[in-house]
Amino acid sequence: MSVLVIDVGTSGLRASVVRDTGAIEHLQYEAFAPQSPAPGLVEFDAQLMRDAVLRVSAAALQAAGSVSAVGITNQRASTIMWDKATGIPCGPALGWQDLRTVMECIMARSEHNMSLAPNQTATKASWMLKNYSHNANVCFGTVDTWVAYVLSNGDLHVTDHSNAAVTGLYDPNSHKWSSRALDIMGVDIAMMPNVVPSSGVIGAASALPGAPPIAALVGDQQGSLIGQGCITAGKTKITFGTGGMLDTFTGPTAPTSANRLAGGTFPIVAYSDAHGIHWGNEAIMLSAGTNIDWLCADMQLIDSPEHSHEVASQVETTDGVVYVPALLGLGTPKWDYGARGTLLGITRGTSRAHIVRAVLEGIAHRGADMVDASQADSGLTIESIRVDG
């Protein structure tokens, strides 16, 4: 048995064939970075994403010959609105890091007691309806929805529970879209995808040779959580990618609300299948690897991300230099959208190595913040952490 796995991340997408032995073969990758036309804005062209998904998938399939099924994992909450009749997006997709809806989140809290973050789908969908030219025949989706739509030649308009639960539009008690949240955001439920289990055949990838069945949809962080073997209460992983996500498996008991909790974390669906829904808790760092990219591409203090370790190891401490990794604001626990990256404690004796080490330590300190917040909100003790990226 072999599965074509399509992974659409924030900075690139890949397709590979995974054998039943766990071996990963025929990896195909394309960089696919979002654009930032102004500070705080993060967007991408969904049609270019469609083309790239089809290219890497076809290349991996050609190398493998055939596969038994297709699985999709994706950056979550990034939002696409398109015309149902034509399949053409109504405008740029809004990336999960986009901050243009900060004021809408503040208003939702003050007027409706809804604790939303701009990195969720809810206010992005509302903003698109107000700002993009469209007719009544439009639909929304996150990246998993879009990829399934593309692979099925438009037959599927679906999302899974793990993606739905981080949109800000999902009711964890009814396991359906929240009519109250949709009404507040001005989104018609007919525009939303059907919510399906993370595991189970949902349709055919008819755009690919052989039309293999699509048998899994799962958000990238939840896929990582399960892949790291975190399937008992308290088991935790942290992923350092473009951003940083700490996820803790909590079990089968649904949270009372999908809103942000007191410590700044969010309830998530870890995964769902025919036997039910399993839950987790997530803490969010809005920028992690982005800070390393900044050191490399913009400040030119290092040659590559890998080079950061070599440079930072040239000194034993930061010599008092402190870095706050807030290039896109601060997430858990404070959720300060106006915060910005800050470098403190610089003296005439500060070297390149001190700054690079301070940036790496700043990311690590934010990781510690997320551990504390997750323990406080989940009531679980995190005894160990599994790390990927």
Model regions and ranges:
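N-terminal glycine/serine-rich phosphate-binding loop of ATP-dependent small-molecule kinases
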Residues: M1-G91, N137, N194, G210-A216, ...
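A conserved helix-loop-beta module that forms one wall/lid of the active-site cleft
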Residues: L182-G200
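Short beta-strand-loop/turn "lid" adjacent to the catalytic site in phosphate-handling enzymes
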Residues: L61-G95, A117-N119, A148-D171, V196-P197, ...
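Glycine-rich beta-strand-to-loop/alpha-helix junction loops that act as flexible
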Residues: T73-S78, S198-G200, F240-G243, S384-G389
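Active-site core segments that coordinate phosphate-bearing ligands/cofactors
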Residues: L4-V5, V102-H157, G168-I184, S206-D388
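Carbohydrate-associated surface elements
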Residues: D98
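Short glycine-rich loop/turn motifs
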Residues: G12, R76, M192, F266, ...
